[in-house]
Amino acid sequence: MAQTLYDKLWNSHVVHTEEDGTALLYIDRQLLHEVTSPQAFEGLKLAQRPVWRISANLAVSDHNVPTTDRSHGIADPVSKLQVDTLDANCDAYGITQFKMNDVRQGIVHIIGPEQGATLPGMTIVCGDSHTSTHGAFGALAHGIGTSEVEHVLATQTLLQKKSKNMLVKVEGQLPRGCTAKDIVLAIIGKIGTAGGTGYAIEFGGSTIRALTMEGRMTVCNMAIEAGARAGMVAVDDTTVEYLKGRPFVPTGAQWDQAVEYWKTFKSDEGAQFDRVVELNAAEIVPQVTWGTSPEMVTSIDGRVPDPEREKDPVKRDAMERALAYMALTPNTPIEAIKVDKIFIGSCTNARIEDIRAAAYVVKKLNRRVAPNVRLAMVVPGSGLVKAQAEREGLDKVFTEAGFEWREPGCSMCLAMNADRLEPGERCASTSNRNFEGRQGQGGRTHLVSPAMAAAAAIEGHFVDIRRLG
C-alpha cells in the first residue's frame, strides 16, 4: 500500500498502539533549551530517574541570552537563573550543550540542523512550538510541553495520536523578489491559521523542491502557524548535500548506508492525502502581515483590508480589533506604512542565506537606515552563522548602513531578553508570530522576509523590493 512521507515516519517509530489509536512513539532526538526544561529535570530528580538515552539529547540556551556584549554575563536575574539552571542540569546528566559563549551556541532550531543533529527519518521533539522547522529534512518534528519533555528524558518515548495527511503543493517558478517566507505566508493566508489543524503537512511541488534547505526550513518553521502538528519536505539530493560533513552525521560506510535509507523518506506514487492544497508560485508576491495573526496577510502592492467588506461577523470583529491594535486605517496602501524598528533574525529567518539576502538589499540601496527608524538590528541565528557572515564582510555592510550587528539568540522574536518593542512601536520583523504583545507589550509586528525588512529599514516604510532588480 502506498504511503505518504508522514505515514512512513509514523509507522517506523510506533512502539505500541492502544485501541483508541493512541500510539507510543520512539523519539530519536530531543532538543532542549532553558525555558521549558527546568521543571522537566526537576521532575526527574524528584522521582530519582536517570536520563534514559543521554546521547539523544542536545541543549542550548537561546531565549534569554543577551544579544549585546556578553562579557558581563546576564543582567536580568530571572533570565540568568534559567540559563544557569540549564547549564547545571546538562552538567549533572552529561548532556551535550552549547553554552552561551560557545561559538556553536544559537537558536535551537538553527543549531540542530547545522550540527547535523537533525537527520532524515528521525522523530524530533523540543519544548518549543517551532520544532516543525526540522521537518524540512524529511523528519517528523513537533513541539511538546514541559511534562512531555520529562517523559522523553525518562523513557525516550511519547504518547501521540496520529494526524491526518495534508499535501500543500506549490508549482512553478517563484517570481523575482519572492522568497520562502513569502511562500509560507501566502499558504497561511490561503488556508488560515486553523487550516492545518489536525493535519501533518507535507510541502511539495517543483517550487518547494527548488528551495535550498534554508528555504525549506523557513516554510516548515511556520507550519505550526497554519495550525498543523508538523510540516515536512521529502528527502532529496539537496537534503543529503546539506548534511554532508556535519559533526553529528555518520561517516564512511555508515554514511552510504544512511543516505540509502534517508532517500526512502518520500511519499510513494499514488499515496492518498486527506486534503490537498495547490498554489501557483507565479502568483505569489512579497507578503506583509497587517494584523495580529499570520493569516492577516496581504501583498506589498495591496492595501489594508476593510472589515466592512467581510461578510462573516466573527472574522469582521477580529479584523476590527486587529486594526485598532495595529493603529491602521482600512484601505491604506501597504507601502505607506512607516516603521519604527527592524528585526532581522529568529528561527524562521536568521540563517546565512537570510543574512545574505538582507545584505544584498542594503548594498543595492546604498544608503543608511532611514531617520524615522529608531533601531535596525540583525541577529544571526548561531555563532557559526555570525562567523560565516563576518568572513563574507556582511556585518560591515550592515553596520556601515546604521544597523546593529548582534550576538545570536531568539532576541526580539518574543522579547524574553532586553530586545523588545515599546508600546506603540511598529516593527518589520522576519520572525513567525505577530500576536498582540509578542515583541513587547503594545508592540505592533509586521511579518516579512529578510529582504523586505532590510528595504523597510533603508526607506523607513514598506517597499516593493521587486523594483530593486
From Swiss-Prot:
<dbReference type="Pfam" id="PF00330">
    <property type="entry name" value="Aconitase"/>
</dbReference>
<feature type="binding site">
    <location>
        <position position="410"/>
    </location>
    <ligand>
        <name>[4Fe-4S] cluster</name>
    </ligand>
</feature>
<feature type="binding site">
    <location>
        <position position="347"/>
    </location>
    <ligand>
        <name>[4Fe-4S] cluster</name>
    </ligand>
</feature>
<dbReference type="InterPro" id="IPR050067">
    <property type="entry name" value="IPM_dehydratase_rel_enz"/>
</dbReference>
<keyword id="KW-0411">Iron-sulfur</keyword>
<keyword id="KW-0100">Branched-chain amino acid biosynthesis</keyword>
<dbReference type="InterPro" id="IPR001030">
    <property type="entry name" value="Acoase/IPM_deHydtase_lsu_aba"/>
</dbReference>
<dbReference type="InterPro" id="IPR015931">
    <property type="entry name" value="Acnase/IPM_dHydase_lsu_aba_1/3"/>
</dbReference>
<dbReference type="InterPro" id="IPR018136">
    <property type="entry name" value="Aconitase_4Fe-4S_BS"/>
</dbReference>
<keyword id="KW-0408">Iron</keyword>
<feature type="binding site">
    <location>
        <position position="413"/>
    </location>
    <ligand>
        <name>[4Fe-4S] cluster</name>
    </ligand>
</feature>
<keyword id="KW-0432">Leucine biosynthesis</keyword>
<comment type="subunit">
    <text>Heterodimer of LeuC and LeuD.</text>
</comment>
<dbReference type="InterPro" id="IPR004430">
    <property type="entry name" value="3-IsopropMal_deHydase_lsu"/>
</dbReference>
<comment type="pathway">
    <text>Amino-acid biosynthesis; L-leucine biosynthesis; L-leucine from 3-methyl-2-oxobutanoate: step 2/4.</text>
</comment>
<protein>
    <recommendedName>
        <fullName>3-isopropylmalate dehydratase large subunit</fullName>
        <ecNumber>4.2.1.33</ecNumber>
    </recommendedName>
</protein>
<dbReference type="InterPro" id="IPR033941">
    <property type="entry name" value="IPMI_cat"/>
</dbReference>
<keyword id="KW-0028">Amino-acid biosynthesis</keyword>
<dbReference type="GO" id="GO:0051539">
    <property type="term" value="F:4 iron, 4 sulfur cluster binding"/>
</dbReference>
<keyword id="KW-0456">Lyase</keyword>
<dbReference type="GO" id="GO:0003861">
    <property type="term" value="F:3-isopropylmalate dehydratase activity"/>
</dbReference>
<keyword id="KW-0479">Metal-binding</keyword>
<dbReference type="GO" id="GO:0009098">
    <property type="term" value="P:L-leucine biosynthetic process"/>
</dbReference>
<comment type="function">
    <text>Catalyzes the isomerization between 2-isopropylmalate and 3-isopropylmalate, via the formation of 2-isopropylmaleate.</text>
</comment>
<keyword id="KW-0004">4Fe-4S</keyword>
<comment type="similarity">
    <text>Belongs to the aconitase/IPM isomerase family. LeuC type 1 subfamily.</text>
</comment>
<dbReference type="InterPro" id="IPR036008">
    <property type="entry name" value="Aconitase_4Fe-4S_dom"/>
</dbReference>
<dbReference type="GO" id="GO:0046872">
    <property type="term" value="F:metal ion binding"/>
</dbReference>
